[in-house]
Amino acid sequence: MLAAIHFLFCKLAQAVGVAAARALPQDPAVPVIATLDLHANISTRIVDNTDILISYITNPHVDQYERAQEAARVMAEMFEGMKPQAAFIRLPIVAPTVTMLTAQGPYADLIDYGQQAKTDAIVNVSVVGGFAFSDLAKNGLAVIVTARSDLATARGLAEDI
């Protein structure tokens, strides 16, 4: 999902789309999983209407296939009973897009730290930078850590990052 999309008449259009997807199934056990690029503008509405958000961990974006595989693995775990719990923190920082490379630099360090900090209790760590050219209040660096069951574990790692 391109998570920085918005229109003049609909800010954060992807939040509207995710909410619509959540409303479709009559069974709340149907997972709603989204993969997104690193330039996502994350809102509480997106987090609340998905079971898990999985961001790319490379910029340039070359890991879409691996993130789709990760989403499929998470879905399989959910069908087996896993109840993911997500902690979401948005920081008041908007990095210029050219500084959001993942091979080296401060943003790469955040991505690497999150990936290295994953344990069996943590199913995903996503650090997204937002899209600097979006004129939105929900723009900026966001950390979403999803635990397999324990929100406190997810929150602790999100705050640490």
Predicted features by range, described:
Residues 1-81:
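Active-site histidine-anchored catalytic micro-motif
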Residues 30, 41-43, 61-67, 87-98, ...:
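Active-site catalytic microenvironments in core metabolic enzymes, especially phosphate/sugar-handling
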Residues 24, 30, 81-86, 134-136, ...:
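Aromatic-enriched hydrophobic runs in primary sequence
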